[in-house]
Structure formats: C-alpha cells, structure tokens
Amino acid sequence: MYIYSNTSAGLLFVKTEAAVSEYRILDSRGKPVCCPKLACVQEKDGWLTTLDARALEFWSVDSPVLYTLEANGESQRFGHMSLRSFQNKQVLLNDTHVYLLGYIRGIVAHDHPNMTGLSDYEAARKNILQAKKYGFNLVRFHSTIPSEDFLRAADELGLLVHMEIGFAYEYDDQGHKKNLSMNNDMWEKSILQYRNHPSMAVFCIGNEMHNSGHYPQVHALYEQGRALAPNKLILDNSGWGEYDRSSADIFCQHIAYFFPYAHHGNMFNVDDPWKFNGSAYDVELETETGIGAANVTAVREATPIRPTLSHEAMHYIDIPDYDALNAKFDAFAAKVGDDYLRRNGIKKPRYLTELPKLIARKGLTADMPDFRRASRSWKLMATKVFLEKLRLSHLCGYEMLQFSDCLKYENKNGIVDFFDDDKGIDAAWLRQMNSDLVLLADMEVPYCYVGDKLHVELYASDFLPKPEIMGTLTVKLDGEAIYTGEKFVLAGGLQRLVKLDMRMQTAGNHTLEAEFVSDGITVRNDWKLWVYPEAVCRTKPQLNIGDGALKDWLSHGSQESDLWITDTLDEKLLETLEAGKTAVLLYEHAAQRNTWQFQGALERFKPCIWDRGSNLGGVIRSKATADAVGGELFDLNMQPLLEAGSKVNLDEFPVKTAEHVLGCDKPVRDRMKGLINGVKDFIDQDTLRRFSHLFSVKIGDGQLIVCTFNLSRPEVPVTANFLQLLVDHTDVLKAESGMSVEAFRAWLEKTNAEGIRKEDVMNHFWEIDNKPVEDTLFWEEAQVNLAQMKSTEG
C-alpha cells in the first residue's frame, strides 16, 4: 500500500494491489476520520483510490500529525503532506515555501554511534529533538540509508529526511573514471520501502557525482523515482552537477570553501560553482568573437534551473576540553558495559588519549582554556556570518557539516557533542539565524571612525507556514531605541525592511539589536559594531619598508625617534638590535627580501574547515593591544589585520618571548598525510602550533617586536589604531627575557639550513584561497592521485 497526497486539492491517493472496498482512517487517538471515497480505478500495476482529504490535518515539521489507514487487511501509518519544488525559486511543503535547515549524518566521518545507552529508537529521538531545539528541520544521511527507527522517530517528531543510496565509479587501468556503478535494485527497493514515511523528503542517488546530467542511467533513475514517489523530491546527487540538468527536482551544490565575508562576501550570489560541471547540453559558457568594430568576450550566466541548497555547509571546527570528554566517555563506558559498547561499535578514539599527551609534551596545558575560548568564539562568529549571508541570497537552504560531533575523528565541527548533549552553544542564539523567520543585517563593514556613518540594511527572511503577518520592528543601539516602525507586513521570503544610516558619535564596542513582534511571534537578532577614534602617530620612526601607503602614513609623526621599523629580516635588523635600539619587524612569511625566515604560515580570515586551515581564532593577551583593536578575541573587526597576513610558529623559538597576540592552530591531522604517506599519528610539528601575530624578545641590548599583521591599509580604523599603539607605545610591548645577537643569528642560520616547512596539502589549499573547491589542477600540483585513495570525508 502506498499513500500520497495532493494537499492543494485536498486529495489522498491510495495505491493497492487489489481494489479498496472497505477502509477507515484513524487519527493518533484511534478516532475515525471521515474521508469519503471519490474514485477507485484500475491501473496497470494495481488500483488507485482517491479520497476526500479535507478533514485531515497536514503533517509538517511543526505539527507532525499522523494517521493510520486500514484497508484490504493492511494497516499503514501516514501523514497528509506534499513536497515539491517550484521553478528555481522555492521548495514547497504542503504548498507553502519552506527554508531547508539541514544537518548531516551517515558515514562514519560525519556521525556517531548510539551513545545513549538506550535503544536506537530512543537515540534517534534524542538526536532529532536536539536538532529541532537548535532550529533544524532536515537531516541528510550522507551515502547512507537511515534506519526504520530513525524514520519512525522523524515521522513522530517532525523532521525531514534526505537519504542516499550510494554509487561508485568504475576505473580503468590508469585510474581514470570510466563508468558509474549504481545499485538500481537498491534504488527501487529503498523508495518502495520508505516512501510512506511523511518525514522522507529527498531520495538521492549519492554524494558528489560530477556531470550527473550527462548519464542516461541517472535520468532513468530520476524518472523511476518520480513515478514511484510523486510527493517526494528526487535528487541525482549531492554536491555537483550541471546547472541546467533535468535529472533532479532540487539541487544541492558545493558552493565554496571560501568564507562569505569581505572579498568573498558575495559567494552565494555568483555562478562560479556551477562552472565546474557547466551545462548538461555542453554549451560554451565563455566565447570570444571579433568583428570589424570590436573584439567581444561573452560570458554566459550559469543560472541553476532548480531551487538550490548549499552542500556540506560550514564544517567549522573548534577545540574541545579533552579532559572533560575523556571523563565523560569513561563514565559512559562504565555505565553501559562492554557488551553494549561492542554491539554498537563504540571504541575510545585515539585522539582522546593522544592529544592530551601532545598538549602536555608541548607545554600547552596552561594555554588550553584560552585556546578553547578563542576557538569557540571564532566558530560562533563564522557560523553567524555564514548563515546570515546565506539567508540574504537566493538559495533555499543548506545542509551543514555537522550538528553532532563525530566520535571517531578529532574534527569537532558539531553544535552538540558526540553524545548529542549540549556543549555550551546556546540554542536560542543559533535560532536567531536558524529558524523559519529571522532578522538579518546587511552592512559592508561593522566598523568605522567616530563621526563616520555606518549604513545598515535590515531584512526579514520569512519562511513561516503562514508568512503574511503584521508586526512592529524595533531597532536599538546599546539598548536604546533608535527606530520603531509599526504595521510592517511581511510578504514571505527575503524582504528588506529598513535602511539605517547611523553617524557614530562614541568610540568603543557597540551592539545593534533588532526585534520584530507580531501576534504570538517575537524574533530578535543582534550584531557587534566597532567605532574607533581617529589615530595619528606622534612618533616619527626610522623606516625601512617597501609599502608606499604604509610608509607615507608612518612618516607624518612630529617627534623624531630612533625607533626602527623594517619589513625585512636581515643583517641590518641585527645591527640595529646590537646597537641597543628598539626595532619593529613587520614580518611577511616567506618574503624573498628576507635573509632568513621564521617557521610560520600565511594567514587568512576564515575558519578551519574539517582539516583545511590553521586559524581557529586568537587571543590578545596584551591589554593595550586589545584596547586598541577593540577586543581580546579575534572577531570581525580583526579582518583587515589578519587577511593575507602571516603568523610565526614559536614552537621551536629558542627562548621565551612576550606573546601579545596568539593565534590558535587546529588539533587535527591532515588527511593526505595518512592517505599518501601512511602517517596517521598526531605530529607535534603539525598540530596545535604556537602561532603568534605579535611578540617581543630581547636581542642583545635591543628590543625586537615582531608583527605579522597585514598593515597595507593604514586608513582602516582598526589598522590605524593598532599602528598608533605599535609606534607610540612600544614600551608596553617590551620583553624581559631574550638572547644575544650572536645566538639569535646562529639560531636563524640553523633553522633555515634545516629548512622552512611548507603547509600540508589541505592547509595549502586553505591558505591560497583562490578557488571555491579543490579542482583537478590543484590535486595535480599537490601531486595527489585521488583515484588511488579512499578519503574519510565526503
């Protein structure tokens, strides 16, 4: 028996092998519901009975109403619901647009076993209730078919489910992809088995199939899926595919591993991700022609023809408390016993024992509270930016890696831990960006000088089941109302509400708040603002720098000084220190002008994505520096200083330094070291490196202050205020300990003779920041043959 609905027409369809004569529909209390029979016709594969469903309530995420149909000796639970896409604009649940707020489970790298000590059904309920508490309405099972227990819980609690049957590529002798290998029987069997679940929303063939619209067998499976489950969405693959293919009802596209801020702030509104697979019809997207009057380049827009989800969104990790996790795991293991652990495939992962050893070995124990605090703040900042930028775009939702931390691997990119317990992220805070109705602020930058204007545009992203509501919008600055607008009528979807021009009068950190109140509905959101005083240096230092704009800005001081500022690590710098002077080194990693290099890396203003990257935020320990830049933890105000800057790795620095600004590295292995070289240990040189963006050390009788920030835009408020501190107040940055000039030179010579380490493969992709996602050219340049390895990540 198969039951599906046409909710707009108020009809219920029942497909059976034999004609339906007597039947009844019962609600959850066992009470009969009147649904008169309208028709019963024979089809080639059975009988189709049409019932009047106007007495039935819809099944939805917010109201998961379930019924039972009894007919022909069978009993089938169902929900009266429909799901379809409309053009390339909307996904419609019960004929009302819905914004899909998804998270990912499934393969071992993105999931965890049953860590409840209870049944699988109870574990599913816990996971779903937690996800809904944080605002999610969809779960994708990556390359996995979920259990009946999970789908039963999803039916009852109201969560949409995206399942994947899985596929593989066949390879030739050279390791090149040849054909698709798909389990067609499993595709049909899975749809037939699960299509009656109202929670079952998306039947998908598999993960990251390139050029799916070019395969006839994919089109055949799509058509079969449409026929077998007309009230579900059929998706050929998650991640790739042509923008104009007809083999899917919804697209789920790999947007980018960029961070949607500043120069990548428009990443959700450009067509670059669609150019990887291009057109299903092999049309050229860029052409050049020449005629007598002009040479013409035409670039065709790759506009997706279906509503689109952001594939494997965010992926942002932070640093957990390993001592607390170990204690929690051990207590759980003792409680449930060995038999339960064995039945559920639960083993204590290596990182829970190896990373605490590494932390102790590297002398980082005292720093870990700061690192955890900084990485959590950084992750929350990045999550907020990503979700709000996404909601300001044309996309219809996302699927996030991930809601629950993975047990097996060390990449902690979840909102809750691998027990599905809260880990300190406030659910109400996340729902400000992760609900049917959210308020958004669009601004170019969140900082300015005193007396300058900040232009802010406030939006509503409204995907309520009944979106047309009237309410009052109140905007506050630091708790004081600056705007109140009554009788705002929301029309549904993305809607600009008001434009604000705020001439900021007071320096310091501020909070902009917005609240929309309607009958029974209140939504809020808030945003940090930084307002800086004008900054002019009194000191006129001695300069040896090549950046013209910075050199000009630093040349306007009125007080001559022997402070030496250079952008080159060379013998001249050592001579200056030997003379007992204070020198500021504006260090650029791997710059050819340097005689020597420090161990270190390039910096980007973006979070670590799984095992890509080396920035988990930072801690500003110098109070004077924190006051100058506007906070003790890295935040949006630090973007001009961090982006395209550098950082020095102090792990092997020969003496203790005064560390004023610390950068947090990730506690995660590079997967390619394991896949290519078979190295799967946690390596001290690669893990939780002691990065610094600002530190001081005595060299001989001189003071060396090393700064790795990007100072190429001194007109930016945070940069100007930091420069004023750096130049006028070097005394607050002085170090007490150090080494001789001779010892420093010898250490530099030894370090450089041994070799400056390059970033691992995945970190290198993160730091070059020039492509949305790793492409064939990148892997070739990195000398990685993907056909010969099996990754742990999807």
What residues fall within each predicted segment?
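Secreted/periplasmic carbohydrate-active enzymes, especially glycoside hydrolases
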Residues: 1-142, 153, 157-161, 201-202, ...
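Substrate-binding/catalytic cleft of secreted carbohydrate-active enzymes
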Residues: 125-129, 138-417
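Extracellular ligand-binding/catalytic regions of CAZymes and related secreted enzymes
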Residues: 410-414, 419-421, 448-459, 464, ...
